[in-house]
């Protein structure tokens, strides 16, 4: 790593890592803030890693990265069967710890992608080879900001060609750091380990290209389940809360429809313009009432709005 936070070289090795401690985000955040926690003995390493993470993020933003930050929501279930009660909590903030992990993950995956290209190893790359307006680079946190930049971004695709990922601000990106959670990461790690151990990758480019359609179909199906699962519990939460007013923000509009974001619950509802006042505009805060809520049908409707 050079002074301007560019990876000078990457040399992966196969070996065993000895875990010194099992630390959570909250403990690391407490230590970085100067408090006592199980992570305190490793404070110097955490500080060095955080400094690297901050420098790496700044470099990515300079190269056009679009970074979206929103709080994580924990869905709590109490009871069983028809007696389940749903509640939502916002996870404790740990921005330094999350930044440390996410940036080192991006750095590693980008470095491995470049190493693989240099050594002729085909990996599965996450690409977004599009031009993003310069004004969209940066860190976005409010519902209106997030809606604006997401609308302008083309979705990333999985392919075997090492092309740029504009949203990440990386020349190439091959996800490899989470082989236990993501199938593309497992394939990429297998390719890397096979080359290091056997002198050749496990699969050829042609074999991975043949695998991609089936893999993408399975990933899309799994993604639908992962998106629907928390959405189902949130819809059940709305239904259990009964008739009440919910804080919301308008994020988009056209002649026929208005899109509303519920920031705390991280849900979006779209309704006809007739439900809104004449002065409706993106960024406007208001309160909404929900009408019919169908958790199993993955649907809910806006019933009424009022300005605040």
Language-model-detected regions and their locations in the chain:
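Electropositive polyanion-binding surfaces
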Residues: 1-308
């Amino acid at each position: 790593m050079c002074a301007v936070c560019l990876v000078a070289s990457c040399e992966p090795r196969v070996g065993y890592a000895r875990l010194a401690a099992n630390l959570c985000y909250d403990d690391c955040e407490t230590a970085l803030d100067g408090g006592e926690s199980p992570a305190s003995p490793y404070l110097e390493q955490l500080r060095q890693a955080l400094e690297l993470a901050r420098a790496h993020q700044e470099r990515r933003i300079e190269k056009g990265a679009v970074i979206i930050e929103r709080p994580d929501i924990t869905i709590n279930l109490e009871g069983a069967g028809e007696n389940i009660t749903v509640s939502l909590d916002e996870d404790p903030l740990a921005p330094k710890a999350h930044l440390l992990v996410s940036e080192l993950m991006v750095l590693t995956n980008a470095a491995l992608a470049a190493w693989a290209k240099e050594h002729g190893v085909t990996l599965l790359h996450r690409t977004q080879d599009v031009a993003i307006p310069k004004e969209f680079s940066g860190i976005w946190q409010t519902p209106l900001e997030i809606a604006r930049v997401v609308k302008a971004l083309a979705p990333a695709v999985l392919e075997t060609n090492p092309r740029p990922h504009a949203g990440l601000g990386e020349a190439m990106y091959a996800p490899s750091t989470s082989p236990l959670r993501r199938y593309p990461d497992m394939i990429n790690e297998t390719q890397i380990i096979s080359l290091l151990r056997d002198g050749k990758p496990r699969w050829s480019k042609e074999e991975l290209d043949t695998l991609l359609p089936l893999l993408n179909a399975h990933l899309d199906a799994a993604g639908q389940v992962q998106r629907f699962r928390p959405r189902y519990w949130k819809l059940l939460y709305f239904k259990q809360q009964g008739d009440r007013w919910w804080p919301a923000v308008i994020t988009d509009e056209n002649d026929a429809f208005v899109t509303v974001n519920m920031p705390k619950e991280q849900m979006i509802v779209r309704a006809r313009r007739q439900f809104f006042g004449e002065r409706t505009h993106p960024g406007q805060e208001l309160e909404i009432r929900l009408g019919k809520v169908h958790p199993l049908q993955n649907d809910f409707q806006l019933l009424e709005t009022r300005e605040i």
